Every structure is written in structure tokens, then in C-alpha cells.
Regions:
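Bacterial Sec-dependent N-terminal signal peptides
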Residues: 1-27, 159, 205, 414-418
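Sec-dependent signal peptide cleavage junction
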Residues: 18-54, 69
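Signal peptide-proximal N-terminal region
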Residues: 77-109
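Short, well-structured alpha-helical segments in soluble
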Residues: 118-134, 246-255
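Periplasmic-binding protein-like
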Residues: 131-141, 159-162, 202-208, 255-273, ...
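Extracytoplasmic ligand/sensor domains, especially the bilobed periplasmic-binding protein
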Residues: 137-139, 144-206, 210-220, 298
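Extracellular/periplasmic periplasmic-binding protein-like sensory domains
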Residues: 274-345
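Segments of small-molecule ligand-sensing domains
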Residues: 336-340, 354-417
């Protein structure tokens, strides 16, 4: 079955209301009707649910966009790409719930479509069926993130933001957890990576004009001023939109390796920079240090040949891991396809933080004391630390995953993970 058919089948099942509610400690999934409502047991306090703990998972399924009022699929044989991330995340969620069910985990899980026209996020968060929720997991956009963070703070329950790499202006909220590390954290990590591995090499940051690029430069400048180690001497070079290799070589040294930081999140800029540096790598040896968005770039293309590239990511799926192999085999056997990164993200976040909730016992205790527990690791070595934006008053603003993996590639092949 091709991926399109697989997702279409999943959409049909979701539109029929299947598995949007799950009592994980039972032997079956509760089948829902086409109204996609939640179970009446959600109105009861946790004690009435025989000790089960209530989890709310928010993700963009776009069911109302994909199906009309009669549950007819709107896109014929096509499958719009904007639906993929939410459905892939949902697949991982379902696999995690299967694993938790096998462990007899006492959970009461509710899944909400953040793109629902009849049940918007704000309405869900204030609804009777949301009452008693002890953990929020969300694949979100900024507006939704702020709503969920606000409710989490009011109810003293943790909210795990699994995808959005920004605090969205949220402060003074110890219930808010960012898993996808912020841009500043990536800059700090890349800076330390260069300090640790290339302390004597010349460093050049190539950038283009732009507000985002100014922010990146400000981060590196601030890190240079506050580092406890010997600061890097970064040379900043602003390039025109139509630059080529000749605009770069004057900043390179033919007698030693130059560390070239790509000071922009623009993927087109990244491709142009890598291609230009690759075209002169017989004369100028360089290591290109890129941004977290580079995971989406195909570096196997011939124009990048021979160029060493390093970029940071907070999520790394080790292909040698037994659970990873098991999930890959499941997808190969059942769907004739490979699981995406979002499948692993869905599995990891739901399994890990549900286990932490069960370990703590819920009841408004939060997860703060167990966020760093290594025994709950699934794929990623999360390093979830408190963030204090104002060091003068030391108010805890939120928690953030500070663990970064540094992926080194040559000709598109991973040659090292640090």
C-alpha cells in the first residue's frame, strides 16, 4: 500500500470517529460515532476512573477540511501534503498507546483535532470533558500554544509542546515545556561545538540581509560576550542575493580549514552557500556549520559533492536501536513504506511523558521533578532544563530541551553523530 493510500485509509477511520478516545488499560479501543465526541467518563474525577490518569493530545488532523458533512473525501485520489505531519504524528501516538496498553498503563487518553470547525481549541479547553486532564501534549502553532500554556498554568498541569521551536512570548509558566529547542539554544550549541572541536580554526559567518539574520548575529555576538571559554573570533560577511563562489573565497584560507557558519534559516540560501563552497573545495577546505532546518535538504545531490556539513537537531533516531528497527519493520510489513520522523516523535512524547505521569501519580503534582529522569528515555536523550529569561529576578519562565545532536554529513551520508 502506498503512503497516499495509507493516509487516506487513516483519514477515513478518523472521520468515522475511530480511536479518538482510548482507555489504555482495557483490551480494546473504544469506537466512537461520527460526532467524534469523547467518552462520558471524561466528566468524572480521576478517582472515579479507577485510578486512571487523563491525558489530552492535540494535533492537526484537518478532518473537517478533508471530509464534507456527509463524510465524503474532498480530494478524490489526491492527498494534500499539509495533512501529513498531523497524521504521521497520530500514527506514532497510536503505536505508543498500543505499547502502553500492553503494559496495562492506567490512562484515559483523549485526542483532539486542532483544525476542527465544530470543536475549536479554546472551546475544548473550557469544556466539561476536558475537566480532570493531568497532562497536555500538543503539536501546535503559536496561537494554540499560548492558549494551552495559559490553561496549563491555571490548572497546574504540564503542557508538552512537541514541535514549535519558540516560546511565543510565554513567561513565568513552569508548566510549559519546549521539546523542539529554540533558535538561541541551537546557536549556543553550535558555538560550543566549534569551541570544543575547532578552537584554533578561522571562523566565518556568511549571512544575507534580513531581520531573522540580524537576530542570529545578535545571538552569536551575545554568546561571544558571555562564554566562559576562549571566545571565537567570528568574521561576519553579508552576501548579496545572487552571490557565487567568488564572493566567498576572499574570506577563506587555502592553507587551513575554515569553519563556515550559515547565518540564515533560509534553505535556498543554504543550498547556494553549500553549492558555492563545494565548487572550490579542491582549493579551500571548509566545514559548513548549518541550521536545524537543514535536515530537510538533500545533500546527496552532485553539486554538494565533497563538502563536509554539520548541523544541529534536538531529535536523532538511531537506526541501530531495536525499537526503531521494530517500528520500521512494522511499517514495511503493513504499509510498504518507512515511518517519518513525526511517527517517532508521536511515539516518543506520548510514551515517555505518559510514563512520567504514571510515575509521579498526577493529581496536580506536575512533572517538574521527573523531567530529567533518564529511565523514561525512548529515542532521545532529552536534557530538559529550566529557563530564566531575566537573570535578575530569577523567575522560572518555562522548561526547554537543551540536548542537541550534531549530525556530520559527507555526500549526504551521515559520517558522525556528536
Amino acid at each position: 500500500m502506498k503512503a497516499t493510500s495509507r493516509y487516506l485509509l487513516l483519514c477515513i477511520l478518523l472521520a468515522a470517529g475511530t480511536t479518538l478516545y482510548a482507555q489504555v488499560d482495557t483490551t480494546h479501543r473504544t469506537q466512537r460515532d461520527t460526532t467524534r465526541s469523547v467518552s462520558d467518563t471524561s466528566l468524572l474525577p480521576v478517582d472515579s476512573l479507577n485510578g486512571r490518569h487523563k491525558v489530552a493530545i492535540f494535533l492537526p488532523l484537518y478532518l473537517d477540511s478533508a471530509f464534507d458533512a456527509s463524510n465524503n473525501y474532498r480530494y478524490d485520489k489526491n492527498f494534500p501534503k499539509f495533512i501529513n505531519p498531523g497524521l504521521e504524528f497520530y500514527e506514532g501516538v497510536q503505536l505508543a498507546l498500543d505499547s502502553l496498553q500492553k503494559e496495562n498503563a492506567r490512562l484515559d487518553v483523549h485526542i483532539y483535532d486542532t483544525r476542527s470547525a465544530t470543536q475549536p481549541v479554546a472551546q475544548v479547553l473550557q469544556s466539561p470533558e476536558f475537566k480532570g486532564t493531568e497532562l497536555i501534549i500538543g503539536h501546535v502553532v503559536p496561537g494554540e500554544m499560548q492558549q494551552m500554556a495559559s490553561v496549563a498554568a491555571q490548572l497546574n498541569i504540564p503542557f508538552i509542546n512537541v514541535n514549535f521551536p519558540n516560546d511565543g512570548g510565554i513567561t513565568n509558566n513552569p508548566e510549559f515545556v519546549i521539546l523542539n529547542s529554540t533558535l538561541r539554544t541551537h546557536c549556543e550549541g553550535l558555538y560550543r561545538f566549534i569551541q570544543r572541536n575547532y578552537p584554533t580554526k578561522p571562523v566565518v559567518l556568511f549571512r544575507k540581509k534580513g531581520t531573522q539574520e540580524d537576530r542570529l548575529k545578535a545571538y552569536f555576538d551575545d554568546i561571544t560576550k558571555t562564554t566562559n571559554s576562549v571566545p571565537l573570533k567570528i568574521k561576519y560577511v553579508t552576501l548579496d542575493d545572487a552571490f557565487d563562489a567568488t564572493a566567498l573565497t576572499s574570506s577563506l584560507d587555502s592553507s587551513t580549514q575554515t569553519i563556515c557558519i550559515a547565518g540564515s534559516l533560509d534553505e535556498n540560501f543554504a543550498r547556494m552557500l553549500c553549492q558555492s563552497l563545494a565548487s572550490v573545495n579542491q582549493t579551500y577546505t571548509t566545514l559548513i556549520v548549518g541550521m536545524p532546518t537543514w535536515d530537510n535538504i538533500d545533500f546527496t545531490r552532485p553539486e554538494f559533492k565533497g563538502e563536509e556539513i554539520v548541523y544541529s537537531t534536538p531529535f536523532y533516531i538511531n537506526p541501530a536501536d531495536n525499537l526503531v528497527k521494530s517500528i520500521q519493520q512494522y511499517f514495511k510489513t503493513k504499509f510498504y513504506s518507512r515511518p517519518s520522523d513525526m511517527v517517532y516523535r508521536g511515539y516518543e512524547t506520548v510514551y515517555r511523558f505518559s510514563k512520567q505521569l504514571l510515575h509521579i501519580g498526577g493529581g496536580g503534582k506536575g512533572l517538574n521533578g521527573s523531567l530529567g529522569e533518564k529511565k523514561f528515555k525512548v529515542f532521545t536523550d532529552f536534557d530538559i532544563e529550566p529557563v530564566f529569561l531575566n537573570r535578575q529576578n530569577m523567575t522560572l519562565d518555562y522548561f526547554e530541551n537543551k540536548k542537541l545532536y550534531f549530525i556530520k554529513k559527507l555526500d549526504g551520508n551521515v559520517t558522525g553523530v556528536y
